[in-house]
């Protein structure tokens, strides 16, 4: 989240107040805990609800991850159910031609969306960090469903606009969900790149050798190896203590030397990092791995920048990653 600027008196500006208000939405809806929605709980004052509505107009199961078509379906159903509260559209196209979906949530009966102070929210820029999409999508759904039930949510949408992009990286997300993968790959998008400089593109990717739908580590028995099989789960390996013999060596992830260059899995899908492709403090590939050829070389980052630049009412932003367990605020 970019930190809100302060005025000359040291008090938060509109951006700061907006960020604080949206933080309340995040806290109240349980988004920080991956949307573990509970029953409605009466609370004093403005904090009047916790969890999800018992009878939503747009029923959505939040115990699963959704593909591109399902996100479109949810977005269009929200727009149909709440025509004065939600607009569903796209900010651009991905490399493979998928729409980068946008939900604009506000009270359209009270002022124009683009003339209210706005919060921009996105997620899932890294294709393996898929939870970000559902958190962003849940935010839009929760605001639409709860505005008629909770006064402070209604007030928020009267005065503010939420621009919500569930995933910046729909191609990478689809590849991560639909194809065999490791927990950390693919992390980028899917535009071909020549990672090993041999003139070929993505020719030595991971290979699902046993056809189980997963890319896992390979092991081989070796009396000089330093790994043991876990007694609790035979799929797990435990490093042997210095005073005990090992039984296996780890060979790396499943794969062949597809291009016969003596290396395995060295030119995978991508690789670039969309989150290193922004103009701010951009560095070339040899300094910052994944930066790609130049800032905004990727259609996905270009679409986000164009949208933000063309919406001067955006006063704060939140982008969802996973695994860090922290909220990072930029300087300023």
Sequence positions of predicted segments:
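M14 metallocarboxypeptidase catalytic domain recognition
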Residues: 40-332
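Intrinsically disordered, low-complexity regions enriched in polar/acidic and amide residues
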Residues: 4-5, 38, 42
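Bacterial N-terminal signal peptides
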Residues: 22-36
């Amino acid at each position: 989240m970019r930190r809100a600027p302060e005025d000359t008196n040291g008090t938060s500006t509109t951006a700061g107040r907006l960020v604080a208000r949206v933080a309340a939405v995040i806290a109240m809806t349980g988004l920080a805990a991956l949307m573990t929605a509970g029953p409605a709980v009466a609370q004093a004052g403005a904090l009047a609800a916790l969890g999800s509505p018992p009878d939503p107009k747009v029923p959505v199961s939040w115990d699963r991850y959704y593909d591109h078509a399902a996100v479109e379906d949810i977005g269009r159903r929200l727009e149909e159910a709440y025509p004065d509260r939600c607009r569903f559209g796209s900010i651009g196209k991905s490399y493979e031609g998928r729409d980068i979906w946008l939900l604009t949530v506000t009270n359209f009966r009270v002022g124009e969306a683009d003339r209210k102070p706005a919060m921009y929210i996105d997620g899932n820029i890294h294709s393996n960090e898929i939870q970000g999409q559902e958190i962003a999508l849940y935010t839009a759904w929760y605001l639409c469903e709860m505005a008629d039930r909770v006064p402070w949510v209604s007030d928020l949408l009267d005065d503010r606009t939420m621009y919500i992009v569930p995933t910046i990286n729909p191609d990478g997300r689809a590849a991560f969900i639909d194809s065999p993968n490791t927990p950390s790959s693919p992390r980028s998008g899917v535009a071909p790149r020549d990672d090993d400089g041999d003139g070929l593109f993505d020719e030595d990717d991971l290979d699902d050798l046993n056809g189980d739908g997963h890319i896992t580590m390979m092991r081989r028995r070796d009396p000089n190896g330093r790994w043991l099989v876990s007694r609790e789960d035979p799929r797990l390996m435990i490093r042997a203590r210095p005073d005990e013999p090992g039984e296996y060596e780890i060979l790396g992830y499943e794969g062949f030397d597809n291009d016969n260059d003596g290396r395995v899995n060295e030119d995978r899908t991508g690789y670039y990092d969309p989150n290193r492709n922004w103009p701010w403090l951009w560095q070339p590939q040899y300094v910052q791995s994944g930066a790609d050829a130049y800032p905004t070389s990727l259609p996905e980052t270009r679409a986000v920048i164009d949208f933000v630049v063309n919406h001067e009412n955006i006063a704060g932003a939140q982008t969802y990653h996973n695994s860090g367990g922290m909220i990072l605020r930029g300087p300023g």
